[in-house]
A protein has these predicted regions:
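Positively charged n-region of N-terminal signal peptides that target proteins for export
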Residues: 1-4
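C-terminal motif of bacterial Sec signal peptides marking the signal peptidase cleavage site
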Residues: 12-15
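Peri-catalytic and regulatory segments of divalent metal-dependent proteins
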Residues: 17-133
């Protein structure tokens, strides 16, 4: 039992890394490149089953807000993985879904059902910024 505890403790120490910006330690069981690859794969799979709006004022708004957030993330945390992300921001046509989400690597989606709730670009930017923090 002591050997197992020692081995587990060693594993936790070895897999810890420092979070840019906060300096806190976090436990990582996979590399950031593995996370980004998994995020990109999951993003493609999810979007296959959704109707993505590619043009129009709402899609342009999501893109513009997303690109501004991505630029800020790169500038604010230059030493973070945000500079390695292949940022994508999609608008999914689903009025019943009041949600947005982000996956590792900067893969982000906003549902059209969220737009009437947020009401303006500032509120949508706040929601998207929150989601991007999960990426």
């Amino acid at each position: 039992m002591k050997k197992a505890l020692l081995l587990f403790s060693l594993l936790c120490v070895v897999t810890c890394s420092t979070v840019p910006g906060t300096g806190r330690s976090q436990l990582n069981f996979m590399s950031s490149s593995q996370e980004m690859s998994l995020g990109a794969q999951s993003y493609r799979e999810i979007l296959k089953g959704e109707r993505v709006i590619k043009q129009g004022p709402d899609a342009e708004m999501v893109q513009e807000i997303g690109q501004r957030i991505a630029k800020s993330a790169k500038e604010y945390l230059p030493q973070s993985d945000a500079n390695k992300f292949r940022w994508e921001f999609k608008l999914i046509d689903d009025q019943a879904m009041v949600n947005a989400w982000a996956l590792p690597g900067g893969k982000t989606a906003v549902y059209t059902g969220l737009l009437p709730i947020t009401g303006d670009t500032d509120s949508l930017a706040m929601v998207m910024g929150h989601e991007v923090a999960h990426a």
